């Protein structure tokens, strides 16, 4: 098992560890939580399924380790690199550069926001729960308290909702 550790926004790292808790490496579960500040160990590796988009980003963006770059990995999230039957060997292609890490971070943020927006809309229209309370529940469930401002997520949701409702009003002629 070859792993790669990258640095992403702290709230996205927490989201991933809760979202993919069932995909954590079994022998690593006894280690301290990656969200604890006392932990100086490498975060627990997440083993993603081949059906997740992030798995394919990891596969496509992994490159051979550059000779002038340290082998010491730092970051707040660790992934097990894909090991397909054919294609890139993770023993060789085991490095994710800074730009690639930003690309992966953006994809994680897209996944998180899609889940958040679906959660907010479903709670509002099926369960009658107000957006603010739903946002609090989402942030609490994914252990993101203190790492993200709920107001910024709510503003982004409202901008998205305004854009979506505007595009539905203007039909092509």
Give names to the regions the model predicted.
Residues 1-96:
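Long, low-complexity interaction regions most often at the N-terminus
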Residues 36, 163-166:
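Short, compositionally biased segments
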Residues 98-113:
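Basic, short loop/linker segments at the boundary and entry of helix-turn-helix/winged-helix-like folds
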Residues 109-129:
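Short, amphipathic alpha-helical "recognition" segments used to contact nucleic acids or chromatin
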Residues 167-173:
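Conserved small/polar residues in nucleotide/adenosyl-binding loops
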